[in-house]
Amino acid sequence: MVYQGNRITVTMLEDGIANMQYNAENESVNKFDTETNKQFAEVVNALEKADDIKGLIVTSSKGVFIAGADITEFVASFKQSEEEIKDWVININDAFNRFEDLPFPKVAAINGAALGGGCEMTLVCEYRVMSDKAIIGLPETQLGIFPGFGGTVRSTRVIGIDNALELIATGTPKKALDALKLGLVDATVAADDLQDAAIDLVKKCISDELDWQAKREEKLVPVKLNQLEQAMAFNSAKGMIFAKANPKQYPAPALAIAAIEKHVNLPRDKAIEVEAAGFAKAAKTPQAESLVGLFLSDQLVKKLAKQHSKKAHDINEAAVLGAGIMGGGIAYQAASKGLPIIMKDIKSEQLDLGMGEASKLLGKMVDRGKITPAKMGETLSRIRPTLNYGDFAETDIVIEAVVENPNVKRAVLKEVEGLVKDDCILASNTSTISITFLAEALERPENFVGMHFFNPVNRMPLVEVIRGEKSSEEAISTTVALATKMGKVPVVVNDCPGFLVNRVLFPYFGAFDLLLKQGADFAHVDKVMEKFGWPMGPAYLIDVVGLDTGVHGAEVMAEGFPDRMKPDYKGAIEHLYENKRLGQKNGVGFYKYEMDKRGKPKKVADEATYELLKTTTDSDKQTFEDQAIIDRTMLAFCNETVRCLEDNIVSTPSEADMAMIMGVGFPPFRGGPCRYIDQMGLDNYLALCEKYAYLGKAYEAPQKIRDMAAAGETFYATA
């Protein structure tokens, strides 16, 4: 035994070949946490002193090779100064550099995901052999940072500037064959043959069949491209990367490119220093704080979903009531994850529409090469369309997805309750109707919950699981388990008008309506909010949702929260709806819609909208600075999020933030409404509320904000 630790061991195999194995005790995956970094440095010390080692393989005892750095440690680490972060990273890099410089060949045997620091560990080896089931990549830019353990330095020298920039800037991991084509790995083999293949490579190095020292040397020197070739590579990459990610919103790719431009002409050790300085700069951006926080929130939400699922019944078959686009989307989602599902409607044309939706979605996957035609047929066979309830006796859970009308929903739920087994869970896919109210029609209200999918079902990850007054833990558990089984991220919320997401969204629409009443141009508001980071502004969003849906939802919300969601004027949204402008669904809303070459609706300006809005705009029109537009819309949005926490509609800031990002597209780089308030500072946010309180209750600071500001608290821990 060369080294024995609880994170890494080094043992001798045969013929002078050592096996350095990552094996984090009591952990599901290997990662570069503080203890692993410490032990890695100790391993390097031991290897430098060993005189009987001729070669070495790097392996993992886990299903994952190495998942990367321990992101939970980033929060504290990134609170350090930029200079301290740089020194911290350089210190870690010292062990990587010394490992690379060891006087014998090293081969990484990549059995599973090698991400971030895991990929960087493989790059300090001369050769990399990969299981055909593994993935490899440098996803750090998705956290607002970029590789800091030599990843930008070695990748540019191993796979070239253009390939390295694409790998780093997109953050997308590569499958084995793609990694092989890129030159990121040297061979791919079946998982069972991996260790033997790695040992064989080491033996070829030892016998001088392979020039491993030349492979190492190319990572120690500047990139072998002349200035013109470098300029072409960087300019091409910048054009592609900046077209996909606005550097003002997501600065990490731009900072990575800047660091690489500086270090491509430097030897390794100097280049590592440049990388470390750039990494430290990225780590201190608010976007890194938000995106690291978002990752941790995502982990928490998934952990809470597991906890909520503990009392779940087995789900062997589901059913959806109501076909059409929504029902078909739900059926597709279940079937694509291996769950048989019955799709029931009273009209055969709706069943055709639902099956057509599922077929269309699967057909697109076939076209992209994601699945085979045979797999498509197998998936479709899991969906059973029917006009009657004959097969419902053994169904474990029924999702009601009929028209958004409380009387229709109550009647349908009452009917199906009498036809299913006693422990069958009933779930209503409603966006605004009270679950407690719908439950009044049922004999077994404890078996009833809300299950709010977002449209389009196949693309929107969030599902709100709504607890009514009488919903049992078993019902909640089973519904959460179903959502997870369907590949969705469930967030459990308590019952109220609009639940969580729509309750927060409608004050945002209300703030937008008030801006228009006072003279703002809806197209300009859209541009401002898109620049702020939203995928679409409020006018475009309500067009996509449907103005009819918006008006109906606003009526429900006004009844539930008349103090802040019942305006004393007719707004632009309602007026356009009354003039039969429904948005994309009938081609005219705030914008006019024309089909592009791909058959997708494209928005264009429509003078008729401005004519109609003259009747809902004040005669003494105001002009608004862009920041005022942002402040007014975001105050209404964030205040209602905080009120949902106050009212225990949602349990944690993490769940609230993730729901707003996944459900309505809150800018991820801002971390969610709670983190947005934290980054603004509670005192500054409170002052902004007081500045705009004259506009109405929606703009007044919730008591929770006042209490937190007085106590010097934040939504997220600062240490």
Curated annotation (Swiss-Prot):
Gene3D superfamilies in the cross-refs: 1.10.1040.50, 2-enoyl-CoA Hydratase, Chain A, domain 1 (3.90.226.10), NAD(P)-binding Rossmann-like Domain (3.40.50.720)
Keyword Lipid metabolism among UniProt keywords: yes
Any GO BP: fatty acid beta-oxidation
Enoyl-CoA hydratase/isomerase: annotated segments: 1-190
Cross-referenced InterPro entries: 3-OHacyl-CoA_DH_CS (IPR006180), 3-OHacyl-CoA_DH_NAD-bd (IPR006176), 3HC_DH_C (IPR006108), 6-PGluconate_DH-like_C_sf (IPR008927), ClpP/crotonase-like_dom_sf (IPR029045), Enoyl-CoA_hydra/iso (IPR001753), FA_oxidation_alpha_subunit (IPR050136), FadB (IPR012799)
Active site residues of this protein: H452
Binding positions (NAD(+)): M326, D345, V402, V403, E404, K409, S431, N455
Xref: SUPFAM superfamilies: 6-phosphogluconate dehydrogenase C-terminal domain-like, ClpP/crotonase, NAD(P)-binding Rossmann-fold domains
Region (3-hydroxyacyl-CoA dehydrogenase) residue spans: 313-719
Gene Ontology MF terms in the entry: 3-hydroxybutyryl-CoA epimerase activity; delta(3)-delta(2)-enoyl-CoA isomerase activity; enoyl-CoA hydratase activity; long-chain-3-hydroxyacyl-CoA dehydrogenase activity; NAD+ binding
Ligand binding (substrate): D298, N502
Pathway: Lipid metabolism; fatty acid beta-oxidation
Superkingdom per UniProt: Bacteria
A cellular-component GO term for this protein: fatty acid beta-oxidation multienzyme complex
Record site: Important for catalytic activity: E120, E140
Catalytic activity: a (3S)-3-hydroxyacyl-CoA + NAD(+) = a 3-oxoacyl-CoA + NADH + H(+); a (3S)-3-hydroxyacyl-CoA = a (2E)-enoyl-CoA + H2O; a 4-saturated-(3S)-3-hydroxyacyl-CoA = a (3E)-enoyl-CoA + H2O; (3S)-3-hydroxybutanoyl-CoA = (3R)-3-hydroxybutanoyl-CoA
Keywords linked to the UniProt accession: Fatty acid metabolism, Isomerase, Lipid degradation, Lipid metabolism, Lyase, Multifunctional enzyme, NAD, Oxidoreductase
EC number(s) stated in the UniProt entry for this protein: 4.2.1.17, 5.1.2.3, 5.3.3.8, 1.1.1.35
Job of this protein: Involved in the aerobic and anaerobic degradation of long-chain fatty acids via beta-oxidation cycle. Catalyzes the formation of 3-oxoacyl-CoA from enoyl-CoA via L-3-hydroxyacyl-CoA. It can also use D-3-hydroxyacyl-CoA and cis-3-enoyl-CoA as substrate.
PANTHER family: TRIFUNCTIONAL ENZYME SUBUNIT ALPHA, TRIFUNCTIONAL ENZYME SUBUNIT ALPHA, MITOCHONDRIAL
Family named by the database record: In the N-terminal section; belongs to the enoyl-CoA hydratase/isomerase family. In the C-terminal section; belongs to the 3-hydroxyacyl-CoA dehydrogenase family.
Quaternary context: Heterotetramer of two alpha chains (FadB) and two beta chains (FadA).
Protein name: Fatty acid oxidation complex subunit alpha
Biological source species: Psychrobacter cryohalolentis (strain ATCC BAA-1226 / DSM 17306 / VKM B-2378 / K5)
Gene encoding the protein: fadB
